[in-house]
Amino acid sequence: MFTATEAVPVAKVVAGNKRYPGVVALDNVNFTLNKGEVRALLGKNGAGKSTLIRMLTGSERPDSGDIWIGETRLEGDEATLTRRAAELGVRAVYQELSLVEGLTVAENLCLGQWPRRNGMIDYLQMAQDAQRCLQALGVDVSPEQLVSTLSPAQKQLVEIARVMKGEPRVVILDEPTSSLASAEVELVISAVKKMSALGVAVIYVSHRMEEIRRIASCATVMRDGQVAGDVMLENTSTHHIVSLMLGRDHVDIAPVAPQEIVDQAVLEVRALRHKPKLEDISFTLRRGEVLGIAGLLGAGRSELLKAIVGLEEYEQGEIVINGEKITRPDYGDMLKRGIGYTPENRKEAGIIPWLGVDENTVLTNRQKISANGVLQWSTIRRLTEEVMQRMTVKAASSETPIGTLSGGNQQKVVIGRWVYAASQILLLDEPTRGVDIEAKQQIYRIVRELAAEGKSVVFISSEVEELPLVCDRILLLQHGTFSQEFHAPVNVDELMSAILSVH
């Protein structure tokens, strides 16, 4: 068990600078990480966090400045720098997990280093090695279990266990809980505390302040490529941290106040069953209403939206749009009926990263921007620029590849796509996942503006604390049905308690 008696640096960046064409990614950054320390790395998207991480892992070379791992300077050519950083004990777990779904937990943990005996893979030794690694972090899964059968939380823990197998000095966790529900976050927090107790230094990247305070003792806050401040979390307010991130005073958003909603149903779901997660789902969405759906990961929230929009088939039930019954929804038909849908994973299903902002904006409604089958690019750019202005999208131009934008700007384009298409009903699945605080607040504002214009929104989020900030009404999905209903203003503590309760 590691006990810190004095600060022992295990990683340092000294006067680190990095520039890309037209962008200063890091500007004279000094950063120190000590043995056994859990240090949060905070900042808006584009603040320089990712560049700093890439430097520490050796995937980026600084234009000037030094990187030290322990007492060794990290140096070498681009082809060998990443391997050298790994040899010195730097590991990273990114948002997009790299596990091989078709292999077992043990095979993933030992990938590339499978033990051999008499020229053959020693599966018994592999299982024993994997079990020791899992037990060290308190991960309760079988080494023989296929990764494809694990829950998202279990996969995240196996990914963390894999980097721990090499006895690292430094582990970087980039948004490790962004796809996890509140109850499952506890498993990751427990694993990180065990890593720290073993003397491993952890850099923890997250936008969830409550979680950060539970797991980290200190934080480095970045803004515009610089270190805006190094703080001890126990005596630093969240208001001050957010002010460091934004470079100005932060105004907290109050929960939505009760609104007078027109009693006009635009979407009704009646007794919908979609095995294995949804048993008996009924609800009504009214004109100008923002309806939140809360629940644990795996409760079936995403499956519900996919069933409504026609991406997944359901066994029984009715969907009614503006009074018209739809027996078997078809995605293309639902779009024509004025429903817009933003998927849970925008990178896989929401954007085409190599296309420009303009082409991504008009993906779903080519009729508006074509004449005699020919795309009218002047019209496309004009409409896209209008959407970019409305949605406060920051990009060099409407032709900028969307994959180069920050997560928040990508998400605003995805939502803006349906504003452009004049959709009257928006189904938003995790619209603020992986975006920074300022972008979240902009998305809240946009959603409320759309509701004020008479559009109706279903809003799913695993960040329970944000639902009261944007929703007029919240339904709690538990055990395949809606168990409770909350009306604005919603107390987040009551909502959280209801979500975590066991009935």
Curated annotation (Swiss-Prot):
GO terms for molecular function: ATP binding; ATP hydrolysis activity. InterPro entries: AAA+_ATPase (IPR003593), ABC_carbohydrate_import_ATPase (IPR050107), ABC_transporter-like_ATP-bd (IPR003439), ABC_transporter-like_CS (IPR017871), P-loop_NTPase (IPR027417). GO terms for cellular component: ATP-binding cassette (ABC) transporter complex; ATP-binding cassette (ABC) transporter complex, substrate-binding subunit-containing; membrane. It comes from the Bacteria. One of its GO terms (biological process) is transmembrane transport. Keywords: ATP-binding, Nucleotide-binding, Repeat, Transport. Transmembrane segments: none annotated. The keyword Repeat applies. Residues 8-249, 261-499 form the ABC transporter domain. ATP binds at residues 43-50. CDD domains: ABC_Carb_Monos_I, ABC_Carb_Monos_II. Pfam families: ABC_tran. Coiled coil: none annotated. The keyword Transport applies. Probably part of a binding-protein-dependent transport system YphDEF. Probably responsible for energy coupling to the transport system. Belongs to the ABC transporter superfamily. This is Uncharacterized ABC transporter ATP-binding protein YphE. It comes from Escherichia coli (strain K12). The gene is yphE.
